[in-house]
């Protein structure tokens, strides 16, 4: 089979949104080459095991390559891709330079093209994300290994917003909690939460493709075999009392989620949010505070912010 590689040059902040657009246009998989990821993966960070000198990568911005089968007439979908990427400015994301190129590939090229960019990566003190096809053994006591298939979009755990959420989860999980993952994408946060000892996990995403991607990754991790994953619009129609709610989604979507999170969170519980770019941080923080939460932690990685908010008990 012949394949077509479509590559979009964009900004670091627009990476995951662009990847999602490419998947929705019919891609069978994506490859993300983000300069910011490599800046955050210096050899001395968390004992990183990647030798950057051996990996070809961009030094600024990002390139997302998507792979389309011959059943997709790519010249017809490229204008739509360009238009949708340009419209990301409506969500506070700058997708520039938004340059699109197209290359014909053989089946063999497609099968291996993106794998050279994906290696075991230590993303927190205790978590290492490993591609599904690689053999890997923990190198330190207490290390938790998560396996992901990066052939789908929705993140591989190395994006700054995902790291912020993972680091936050390490600070609030004690074991046995009930957690809700809103906008689960790849399912990486749900898998990590189970590995850290959470009891029950509900994972939701509006996109059916994301739900399928998450289920694929859940199946790769026996610890997450009982995670409930389903399509849903944020927490609309959900009526539960969770100990932790985590959302790695854009700020514009976090804002309407806040009252839903407040309704579905136990007193004494935590709301973790990331996906918040610099110029949206203050409005998100204000919205969370006005809903009755206390901000207990604010973290930042590059232009991205993470928030941990606590819902006080009557005794607090």
UniProtKB/Swiss-Prot annotation:
Q: Could you say which residues bind S-adenosyl-L-methionine here?
A: 162, 183, 205, 248
Q: Which family does it belong to?
A: Belongs to the methyltransferase superfamily. PrmA family.
Enzyme class (EC, first level)? transferase
Q: What does this protein do?
A: Methylates ribosomal protein L11.
What GO cellular component entries does it have?
Answer: cytoplasm
Q: What is its main location?
A: cytoplasm
SUPFAM superfamilies from the xrefs?
S-adenosyl-L-methionine-dependent methyltransferases (SSF53335)
Show the GO MF annotations.
Answer: protein-lysine N-methyltransferase activity
Q: Which CDD domains match?
A: AdoMet_MTases
Which keywords appear in this protein's UniProt record, sorted alphabetically? Cytoplasm, Methyltransferase, S-adenosyl-L-methionine, Transferase
EC assignment: the record states 2.1.1.-
The protein's annotated catalytic reaction(s) are: L-lysyl-[protein] + 3 S-adenosyl-L-methionine = N(6),N(6),N(6)-trimethyl-L-lysyl-[protein] + 3 S-adenosyl-L-homocysteine + 3 H(+)
Compartment annotation: Cytoplasm
Q: What is the protein name given in its UniProt record?
A: Ribosomal protein L11 methyltransferase
Entry keyword annotation includes Ribonucleoprotein? no
